[in-house]
């Protein structure tokens, strides 16, 4: 059933979708940015029924206020805000946080808009009209792939050229001591490369490793993640020396990698 969602269709979706509530599922906080009052109310009602805490705001000022005073697990942003560009909210949040960002849009549906949103750090892009039950499923997917706030028990560090990726702290550091922020997808993708240096990895393998949805517009999501990683790692992203393309086969990481297991180095 496709909905935008209307009140009638929404009520039907609630009745049919009540089995989507997972036993013992912790209460997660969804922050919605949408200046459509009716849409805000419908999403709040539906997600609340399915064991989510939802805060809905109409603009970036209210968004920033909530974000600074509460723990947020996933952000949903409508691109088509009347007074501002939703992409700016995405850009600003992705630059300083790994909170998953889901974009919803009814007008800006060109491939360029979707690719730009992904490049800026969005986790998902949903076109209106959409299925409210699919919307719920996408939120759950975004929450599953978010890195844990608690530090990982994996104590490995990967050293390559003048970079170090620390798994316990989930940090990418340069030899000079500067930290480069990575989104969850970028982190997972880089780790996949570092665990198998110089092995050609197919796009399907990389999709699984990075936990990116492989459907519709997301067929290009690996290319987008590769581009973003190259921009962060390579001196000249247009002539990459680390992440290289194997034509017709996938990508490979062309560098020596040393692995430290809590102090012990291994090649």
Curated annotation (Swiss-Prot):
Transcription recorded as keyword: yes
Modification(s) after translation: Phosphorylated by wide host range (WHR) VirA protein.
Primary location: cytoplasm
Offer a single GO CC term for the protein: cytosol
Localization per Swiss-Prot or TrEMBL = Cytoplasm
GO MF annotations, alphabetized: phosphorelay response regulator activity; transcription cis-regulatory region binding
Q: Which UniProt keywords apply?
A: Activator, Crown gall tumor, Cytoplasm, DNA-binding, Phosphoprotein, Plasmid, Transcription, Transcription regulation, Two-component regulatory system
Q: Which residues, as ranges, make up the DNA-binding region of this protein?
A: 155-255
List residues modified as 4-aspartylphosphate: 78
The protein's role, per its UniProt record: VirG is required for the positive regulation of at least two vir loci encoded by the Ti plasmid of A.tumefaciens.
Name assigned to this protein: Regulatory protein VirG
Please give the organism.
Rhizobium radiobacter (Agrobacterium tumefaciens)
């Amino acid at each position: 059933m496709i909905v935008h969602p209307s009140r009638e269709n929404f009520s039907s979706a609630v009745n049919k979708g009540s089995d989507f509530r997972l036993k013992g599922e912790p209460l997660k906080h969804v922050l919605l940015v949408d200046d459509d009052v009716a849409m805000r109310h419908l999403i709040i009602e539906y997600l609340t029924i399915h064991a989510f805490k939802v805060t809905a705001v109409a603009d970036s000022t209210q968004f920033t206020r909530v974000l600074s005073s509460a723990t947020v697990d996933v952000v949903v942003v409508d691109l088509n805000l009347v007074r501002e560009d939703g992409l700016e909210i995405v850009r600003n949040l992705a630059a300083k946080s790994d909170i998953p960002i889901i974009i919803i849009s009814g007008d800006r549906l060109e491939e360029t808009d979707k690719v730009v949103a992904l490049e800026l750090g969005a986790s998902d892009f949903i076109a209106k009209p959409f299925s409210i039950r699919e919307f719920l499923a996408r939120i759950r997917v975004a929450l599953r792939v978010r890195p844990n706030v608690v530090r990982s028990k994996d104590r490995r560090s990967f050293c390559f050229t003048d970079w170090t990726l620390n798994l316990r702290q989930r940090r990418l550091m340069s030899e000079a001591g500067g930290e480069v922020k990575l989104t969850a997808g970028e982190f997972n993708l880089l780790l996949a490369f570092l665990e198998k240096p110089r092995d050609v990895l197919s796009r399907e393998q990389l999709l699984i490793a990075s936990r990116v949805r492989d459907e519709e517009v997301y067929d290009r999501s690996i290319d987008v993640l590769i581009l973003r990683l190259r921009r962060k790692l390579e001196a000249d992203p247009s002539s990459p020396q680390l992440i290289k393309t194997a034509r017709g086969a996938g990508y490979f990481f062309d560098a020596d990698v040393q692995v430290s297991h809590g102090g012990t180095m291994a090649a």
